[in-house]
Curated annotation (Swiss-Prot):
InterPro entries: Ribosomal_uL22, Ribosomal_uL22_bac/chlpt-type, Ribosomal_uL22_bac/org-type, Ribosomal_uL22_CS, Ribosomal_uL22_sf. One of its GO terms (biological process) is translation. This is Large ribosomal subunit protein uL22. It comes from Mycoplasma genitalium (strain ATCC 33530 / DSM 19775 / NCTC 10195 / G37) (Mycoplasmoides genitalium). Residues 123-144 are annotated as: Disordered. The gene is rplV.
């Protein structure tokens, strides 16, 4: 089972937040908390709060055991950008974009769940490509 927590419009660029997200994916929650506490990045603070929220969601709402939980997925997508102007030389100006992120952390208690999801995705891709190849073969037959 998967439990998750979301946080929208966090004032940090998604590129910087993804660096910290990559550190904790696949780790047990205790290890992930230690990594985030010792990471000197602004995103680590936001992800720590979000991880604690996801842990409480998993234990209270879904009845999962805290000992088995691990970080199934951590995503930092782009949120809305604020555009500001900054004065430049000779009376001109340029635009500053202050980016924000939408953060999502998913926790799971089943270690095989990630493998199952990957195999399902691979099967879907195979079906789609096989269907595409069959359509191309039909088009070639019609042309001949």
């Amino acid at each position: 089972m998967i439990a998750f927590a979301k946080q929208y419009r966090v004032h940090i660029s998604p590129q910087k937040a993804r660096l910290v997200c990559q550190l904790i994916v696949g780790k047990k929650i205790n290890d992930a908390q230690n990594i985030l506490l010792n990471t000197p990045k602004k995103a680590a603070y936001f992800l720590t709060k979000l991880l604690n929220s996801a842990i409480s969601n998993a234990t209270n709402n879904h009845g999962m055991s805290g000992d088995l939980l691990y970080v199934f997925e951590c995503v930092a997508n782009q949120g809305p950008s604020m555009k500001r102007t900054i004065a430049r030389a000779k009376g001109s100006g340029s635009v500053l974009t202050k980016r924000s992120s939408n953060l999502v952390i998913k926790l799971s208690d089943n270690p095989n769940e990630r493998k199952l999801l990957l195999t399902q995705q691979k099967e879907l891709v195979k079906k789609r490509t096989m269907g595409h190849k069959k359509e191309k073969a039909k088009q070639k037959q019609k042309q001949q």
